[in-house]
Amino acid sequence: MWLQQRLKVFPGLLSSSWARRVLAVSGFLVIIYWYIFSGSLFRSFWYAGPPRGISGACLHGQTMQWKALAEKGDVVMVSFPGEETKMQGPTMVGNGHIIVDVGKNNLWVSSLSVLFHLTNYSPLTFVKSVGALAETHATAIFFKEGLIRTIRCLQMEASDSSHDCVTVREDHFAHRSRPHVYVQKIHIANPSDRVVTFDISSQKPLTGETFTTSVEKVQERQFLLSSGRVSVEDGKIILVVVATKKLVSRLQVSPKSDYDETVFSVVYASEPIDPGKVSDTFSKLRESAKKEMFELMHMKTEDLFHEHQQIWSDLFVSGIEMKKIKDLHTPSRDTINITLYYMLSCSLAPLVDPILSNEERDKMESFLNYADHCFTGHSTMHAENLWPSSLSGITQLLQLWDLWKLTLQKRGCKSLVSAGAHGLMQGMLLSFGGLQFTENHLQFQSDPHVLHNSYSLRGVHYNKDLINLAVLLDKDEKPFLHVSVKFQDKLVKLYACEAGCLNEPVELTSEIRGHIFPVLVTQPLTPLLYISTDLTHLQDLRHTLHLKEILAHEEHMAKQYRGLPFLFWFSVASLITLFHLFLFKLIYNEYCGPGAKPLFRSKEDTSV
């Protein structure tokens, strides 16, 4: 009976326009909340499992390793059917001299005195199947190989088996130690019982000044030589010459066979010149492009790729790994890796340039091994403009590159920036963790308030050794520091001590288990960790810091956040007391004041 009476109230409530609005807004907010906080469950209805169809099953088999590599942070998905991708930026490869925007088929060039400019040349070679019934493709960036890989699976005939699908794999990379070389590797696998035909073509620009192309021949080998120009400031122009391997327009792949092709492109660009010097400059650029193309034609493709891959692998020996993120302003692992890849792709690598003199190389390596006074100031971990989650295109990417170089130069890392890609990686690594080299030691001066995030910095150069430093959390969510060393050259003793250096410095070893240091916070605030080759220097530090107190991290945080002030709690208590006094007064007046009603009726009253 009680429930029926309560249910009768609802129609009356809904008859009010105000109540209907409140109900509608509440329902809308519930839907939004459910979408945001149950994203993985909700999206599983739309992105359920691998891509469907014969070609989709084939693609799933071809890319099974991608998921494992993505979990390790070595790969980021650009596009994958049936799944959300984390790539929010241009699909590009570069080496500091050229940038190829694979997604938009654009070529950007730079010179010693001028930053990157967009050309009107289309560098990609397109391989289009003839007669495919269905096609599925996926693209990913491989950081340690410095390339973009696209896999396409083609269903050529009605079949129930994915094993009959034709696979086309394309690798794109701008060679790391050969700054003028762009490579597109094509591999076609045809396991079916029929001949498969492909059209080979390149896209011509629809607008702008086109490149003029001629066919050149060197020792029975043909290649295309394209020439064009780019207008820059002050009425000057940059001349661009591109030599590209000449391919057939139509290709047939026999049954049960594979086909491999490597398309080399050699790109030379001039310094800004006056229009009157075009003829002589073009002649020099063409000769340089022909010479390098001739060298490439006599090289093994495997050797060329190994050169490139080894350098990128060495670059990513250093890096940043986010293990646990507890706030919204800390960049994710993928955002960090993509940003590192972009910045390295825009930078030259003079340390691997064969024409660099031994004297210059030794000088750059000394900068890399001990970057004195880098990085000064606070950590860049939460600088969202330096670690953006998305980029609109190459133009914004180049602006980010300029911002990173400017930031590092102004924070004492000018020598690292001059060392090119290798130095830029070290500078970004030091800046993220708040690491700084001084005259005698390396210090970790991260803000104690951000240590609720767990992360690791690997491959920090100290002399010729590599230091790995991690901020980890124990079972009680309390932070501690883990340090390990990978010795590269002759054994040099390294020592470390935590904030204040009250305890005897510990000698660091190459043991896998590493060394653990507590997080101590001093007053006034000093670095959380010191690392040095000079034991006496660390022992003397304790006498020169002049500290008031040293607290454990949790004690420091407790003092920082002691709760709300006394005045607030006094006000709340006063309001509660006044409310109860007011309530007591109402009850008293009702039953005990003048004109109060009796609590119980007399028997005479009940008989009336």
Curated annotation (Swiss-Prot):
Organism annotation = Xenopus tropicalis (Western clawed frog)
Where is this protein found?
Membrane
Organism phylogeny: Eukaryota, Metazoa, Chordata, Craniata, Vertebrata
Q: Is Iron-sulfur given among the entry's keywords?
A: no
Identify one Gene Ontology CC term for this UniProt entry.
membrane
Residues carrying covalently attached carbohydrate according to the record: N337
* Membrane topology field: Single-pass type I membrane protein
Q: Keywords of this protein's UniProt record, alphabetized?
A: Glycoprotein, Membrane, Signal, Transmembrane, Transmembrane helix
Q: Name one Pfam family in it.
A: DUF2152
What residue range is the signal peptide? 1-38
Record topological domains on the Extracellular side: 39-563
Protein name (database record): Uncharacterized protein KIAA2013 homolog
Outline which residue ranges sit on the Cytoplasmic face: 585-608
Q: Where is it chiefly localized?
A: membrane
The membrane-spanning stretches of this chain are: 564-584
Q: Can you tell which superkingdom this protein's organism belongs to?
A: Eukaryota
